[in-house]
Regions:
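N-terminal catalytic cores of NTP/NDP-binding nucleotidyl/phosphoryl-transfer enzymes
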Residues: 1-7
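Active-site cores that bind ATP or allylic diphosphates and position pyrophosphate for catalysis
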Residues: 22-214
Length: 214
């Protein structure tokens, strides 16, 4: 919603020492490519010792087993995933169903059904594939879950924050954002400057869909 320079400024104001950019081709790609691209860039700095990420599942053993299983999927699992995709399932759902049908441990299947855990598993896979010595540090995802639309307590999901910003309701975000971020957003809204939202692209997307051939 906000340009990369403003987001980088917020990160630095919040205590980050370095902000790195992930190319759009990777940031808009699958969790696997997103994770591998991110870890590859971090490895390139030569100073990566720990990789911290949020996850609904925090048992390291489960995430490591899931990373191993998804790195060496059998032909049967791959074929089932292909069939599921042809039925219109999303890739995460297709893989979840394929693993469940193959008798994979239920705790691994559960971890792969949670969005943040799935990305964490891909980070662990990427660390292994790139031969990194960095140690994964798992942080428990609590209170506001992925895509939660509620603004309550002291935590809010990114989805809920984006919705509030799109509704130009900055005041409701005061307790959920760092002071610098809140003041910048409030200042923009007071000047009538709205950040880019999905509604700004709806006509373009609709045109593209209607122009597609069968």
């Amino acid at each position: 919603m906000f340009d990369k320079r403003m987001r980088a400024k917020w990160a630095l104001k919040g205590g980050a020492d370095l902000v790195l950019q992930l190319p759009s081709a990777l940031s808009l790609s699958s969790a696997e490519r997103f994770a591998k691209g991110s870890v590859g860039i971090l490895e390139g700095t030569g100073v990566l010792n720990y990789l911290s990420f949020g996850s609904e599942v925090t048992e390291a053993d489960i995430l490591h087993r899931a990373a191993h299983i998804t790195s060496f999927e059998t032909e049967k699992i791959k074929e089932t995933i292909k069939t599921q995709l042809e039925l219109g399932r999303s890739f995460p759902r297709a893989r979840h169903n394929a693993l469940a049908e193959s008798g994979i441990q239920s705790d691994v299947v559960h971890a792969l059904s949670r969005p943040n855990s799935t990305l964490g598993i891909e980070y662990i896979k990427a660390l292994k594939q790139l031969g990194s010595k960095a140690e994964p540090v798992i942080i428990k995802r609590m209170h506001a879950m992925h895509d939660s639309s509620e603004l309550k307590g002291s935590f809010a999901s990114a989805s809920a924050i984006r919705r509030a910003v799109e509704c130009e309701d900055a005041e409701t975000l005061k307790s959920f954002l760092p002071e610098q971020v809140f003041s910048d957003i409030a200042a923009m809204q007071s000047l009538g400057q709205s950040p880019a939202g999905h509604k700004d692209f709806s006509k373009i997307i609709l045109y593209a869909v209607r122009s597609m051939s069968e």
